[in-house]
UniProtKB/Swiss-Prot annotation:
GO terms for biological process: translation. Residues 119-146 are annotated as: Disordered. It comes from Lactobacillus helveticus (strain DPC 4571). Belongs to the universal ribosomal protein uL3 family. This is Large ribosomal subunit protein uL3. The gene is rplC. The keyword Ribosomal protein applies. It holds the Pfam family Ribosomal_L3. NCBIfam families: L3_bact (TIGR03625). Part of the 50S ribosomal subunit. Forms a cluster with proteins L14 and L19. One of the primary rRNA binding proteins, it binds directly near the 3'-end of the 23S rRNA, where it nucleates assembly of the 50S subunit.
Length: 212
């Protein structure tokens, strides 16, 4: 069954394995999540557990948010997400989910929001090659031809625009270390997002054997 937790990306560091191998890891702080709601087929049409992470100031919360949090006997949360495919009997509204839900060697998927780069051109956004800089060329960093026949821009044409700030999931990452007393997960490799961005860590649905 699926397990999941919400957390915050702290940054990257390096640790040594038991075999003395230096491994780059991302440090994820996941203080205890509160189970805000348990959704069932009878009441909602599907099964899921709704988790809440990081307290939100009440002055910034509206009445529906406060009422929803009151049912779980907790304060309003800043980051709320659902985890599907879980064993519902293991969760109760108001209970907590901690990092020791996972163990070292677990394979997980991590979902976050990619870093924003603002408005960028084709070369940075799509990796397009530039044109010649000299010998009379007038094609340097522009997008290129839009087509010679149709009188419109084709759908999906790679053009300049806003880069980043999109939902990204990286699959089959390995948990190298669990530090339960500090509410920290150390995940091998990098995860989406900037420092202090909010992420979702859950069991990989297409897990492959961990490469140790």
């Amino acid at each position: 069954m699926t397990k999941g937790i919400l957390g915050r990306k702290v940054g990257m560091t390096q640790i040594f394995t038991k075999d003395g191998v230096l491994v780059p890891v991302t440090v994820v702080e996941a203080t205890p999540n509160v189970v805000m709601q348990v959704k069932t087929v009878e009441s909602d049409g599907y099964e899921a557990v709704q988790l809440g992470y990081q307290d939100k100031r009440e002055v910034l919360s509206n009445k529906p948010e406060k009422g929803h949090a009151d049912k779980a006997k907790t304060s309003p949360k800043r980051f709320i997400r659902e985890i599907r495919g879980v064993e519902l009997k293991d969760y109760e509204v108001g209970s907590e989910v901690t990092v020791d839900t996972f163990k070292e060697g677990d394979v997980v998927n991590v979902t976050g929001t990619s870093r924003g780069h603002g408005y960028q051109g084709n070369i940075k956004r799509w990796g397009q090659s530039r044109g010649p800089e000299t010998h009379g060329s007038r094609y340097h960093r522009i997008p290129g031809s839009m087509g010679s026949i149709i009188n419109r821009v084709p759908k999906g044409k790679r053009l300049p625009g806003h880069m980043g700030m999109k939902k990204v999931t990286i699959e089959n990452l390995v948990i190298e270390k669990v530090v339960a007393d500090k509410n920290v997960l150390m995940i091998k490799g990098n995860v989406p997002g900037a420092k202090n961005s909010l992420i979702v860590v859950k069991t990989a649905s297409k897990a492959v054997k961990a490469d140790k």
